[in-house]
Amino acid sequence: MYNRLITIYIVILGFIIPLSGYAQPKYEIRATWLTTLGGLDWPSHKATSAKTIELQKQELCKTLDALKRANFNTVLFQTRLRGDVIYPSAIEQFTESLTGHEGGNPNYDPLKFAIEECHRRGMELHAWIVTIPIGNTRQVKLLGKKSVTRKQPSICKLYKGTWYLDPGNPQTDNYLASIVREIVSRYDIDGIHLDYIRY
């Protein structure tokens, strides 16, 4: 009887042990932030003509190629900066980082292009959204009529010369959620990265 139980246990273990080798591999995120504010990481060329649009695109492709070679698999792409964005939006205007002029249309969709190029390289793109800071008084003036400080002043606060969305106001949640909804409904992004959730 004892020998029979030992044999049964050995047979059962013979089936169980090999199955443990088929566990799902761990997915590892190897990410970096790609800053568009002031062209810190990208773009260094302003999209003002067909030639400079192409230079802007080539620069992004070179950056993504370098990240791929360095074994990154995720790009946290700064999509909302300080009250402005890098895609055509019904809520906020284009950032001056793209054209040199706040609200200037770069005549292509940089977010769509970045997503396509990341996916072409087998990389994910997460939309990096700066949530609370809007900018100093000079920067907010440049945002003009489309600035959230003009459209929805009740959710904005000026503190020591810098404008912020008010995280204590429930309408701020609605405003930020509308930006996220706009992005996820229009683009094939792989994630959302919320940053500066503070004063």
Model-based region annotation:
Residues T7-P18:
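Bacterial N-terminal signal peptides
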Residues G21-P25:
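Boundary at the C-terminal end of the N-terminal hydrophobic targeting segment
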Residues Y27-I29, T35, G39-Q58, E116, ...:
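Active-site-adjacent "subsite" loops/lids of carbohydrate-active enzymes
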Residues R30-L34, V75-F77, L125-A127, I192-L194:
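Hydrophobic faces of well-ordered beta-strands that scaffold small-molecule active sites
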Residues A31, L67, V75, C118, ...:
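Conserved, mostly hydrophobic/aromatic
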Residues Q58-D84, Y187:
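Catalytic domains of carbohydrate-active enzymes, especially glycoside hydrolases
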Residues F77-V130:
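Aromatic-lined substrate-binding rim segments of carbohydrate-active enzymes
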Residues D84-E92, I134-K146, R186-Y199:
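Active-site-proximal loop/short-helix segments
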